[in-house]
Amino acid sequence: VGQEEDFDAVREKALKCGAKDFILDDVRREFVEELIFPAIQANAIYEDVYLLGTSLARPVIARGMIETAEKMQCQFVSHGCTGKGNDQVRFELAFYGLNPDIKVIAPWRIPKFYQRFAGRSDLLEYAASKGIPVTQTKSKPWSTDENLFHISYEAGILEDPNTTPPADMWKLTQAPEKA
């Protein structure tokens, strides 16, 4: 969906983690034509500030996943969305709408998984112990969701509106006084 990403590194990481293959679909055109342009035309901005870039990207990602799953004759797809957020619903409704027979593996809803990994710290420790490269660190625990339309950040330290986000977090912007 147009994020800035080192896909060779993603491929290497996927294979190192046990994937049998890595398939990269370029869905930027579909994302722009089917979702971004109509959203701009409709002035689709949540609460007058949020561009909906994350939620807009999910249908085109889900469609690509289902098309690939069907081509590879897979019975299952998976996502890494937490069991608390809207993303799991966005993905799964799209999956089932496109292929009602598909089975979805959602690790964050599997008790054995979420009991083992209570949060980001546990995941970071596990990745480090297995030599799995990740961009987050304990000092920079936020995750990003980036696409052609926007970028969003998420982490516990960002949930408190009285806490100013770290200046080195921003990727597409910077403080006005530094512009």
Stretches found by the model and what they are:
Residues V1-A179:
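Nucleotide-activated chemistry modules centered on ATP-dependent adenylation/adenylyltransferase
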